[in-house]
Amino acid sequence: MSQKYLFIDRDGTLISEPPSDFQVDRFDKLAFEPGVIPELLRLQKAGYKLVMITNQDGLGTQSFPQADFDGPHNLMMQIFTSQGVQFDEVLICPHLPADECDCRKPKVKLVERYLAEQAMDRANSYVIGDRATDIQLAENMGINGLRYDREILNWPMIGEQLTKRDRYAHVVRNTKETQIDVQVWLDREGGSKINTGVGFFDHMLDQIATHGGFRMEINVKGDLYIDDHHTVEDTGLALGEALKIALGDKRGICRFGFVLPMDECLARCALDISGRPHLEYKAEFTYQRVGDLSTEMIEHFFRSLSYTMGVTLHLKTKGKNDHHRVESLFKAFGRTLRQAIRVEGDTLPSSKGVL
C-alpha cells in the first residue's frame, strides 16, 4: 500500500510568521497557528505522514544566526512531540534567493527522495503552505497543493477536507472477449447504473449495491453471442478490483460481516476483508439458467470477485425457488459487505498492522 504524505511549510502555516522581519528568532515570536496540533493529530490518525519543509533566508549568517533559530525551533519541535505530532523529517533551505541554490522552494531538491520512491501515494499527498511558492512546489512534485489561510482555508478546514470519506475507484478492463468499465462510490448511496447485457445479472448486481449501501456504475460489452461466461467472470474480476481500490488503506473499517433470510430461502454469508482471497461456496439449483443468467456462473462470479478484491468469502443458500436462491446470495453478499466496509474509527483492524 502506498503512503500518503503531507509536506508542510513552517512559518505562516504551522507557526505564525512575524510581519516585521519574517524571522522566528526569539522565543517571544513563537506562536502556533490556531488548531494546528489537533488537526495534525487527526491527519496522522487518517494515515498521513508529516514532512516539514521550509525556506529560512540566510540561516547561519550574521543576519540570521543559527543559535537564534535553534532555540524557538527546538521548542516548537518539543511541543509538537509532547502532543503526539511526529514529523518524519524536517527539510530546511538556509539560502537567500540571490544564492540561486537548487534546494529552495519551489525547487524539488529537498524532496527528491520522496519523488524517487514508488511507495508515495501521489494522488493523496499534498503540499500545505501559505505562499504561492508552496503551491508551485506541489505542481513541481506532481501532487496536490493547499494554500493555507486563517480565514479561507485554516487547519480545521484542511483536516476536514483531507479526512472526509469519499471512497471511489474506477476500473477499466479490456480483453478480446469483454470491454468493462466499473465505477464504485462506497460512501454514496443510490443511483446505480448497471448494463452488462445480461438482464438478470444486472438485477443481481444492483442487489449488491442496494443492500451494500453504495453506488456503482457498470458498463459491459461482452461476447454474449457465444455465452455469458466471459461477461460474468470478467465483471466479477473488475468489480472486485474496484472494491479493493475504493477501500484504500482500510483504516477504520469493520472488516467482518455476516447474514440473510429471504422468503423460503436461508442464505449465509461470512466475509473477511483479509487480503487473502478464498471462496467457500455451496448452492444447488434445479435449472441451468435463471432468466438469461447461467446458474453455474454464479459461483464463478463470486470466485473472480473474491480473488481480485482479496477477501475470504463463505456463501451458502438453501431454498426451493432458483430465482430466490440466486437473489438471496447476492443480497446476503451485499448486506454483509455493507457491514464490513462501514467505517467506525481510524485504526487498522488487524494485529499485523496490514490488510
Curated annotation (Swiss-Prot):
It is found in: Cytoplasm. It catalyses: D-erythro-1-(imidazol-4-yl)glycerol 3-phosphate = 3-(imidazol-4-yl)-2-oxopropyl phosphate + H2O; L-histidinol phosphate + H2O = L-histidinol + phosphate. One of its GO terms (cellular component) is cytoplasm. GO terms for molecular function: histidinol-phosphatase activity; imidazoleglycerol-phosphate dehydratase activity; metal ion binding. It holds the Pfam family Hydrolase_like. The keyword Cytoplasm applies. The active site is at residues 9, 11. HAMAP family: Bifunc_HisB (MF_01022), HisB (MF_00076). This is Histidine biosynthesis bifunctional protein HisB. It comes from Escherichia coli O6:H1 (strain CFT073 / ATCC 700928 / UPEC).
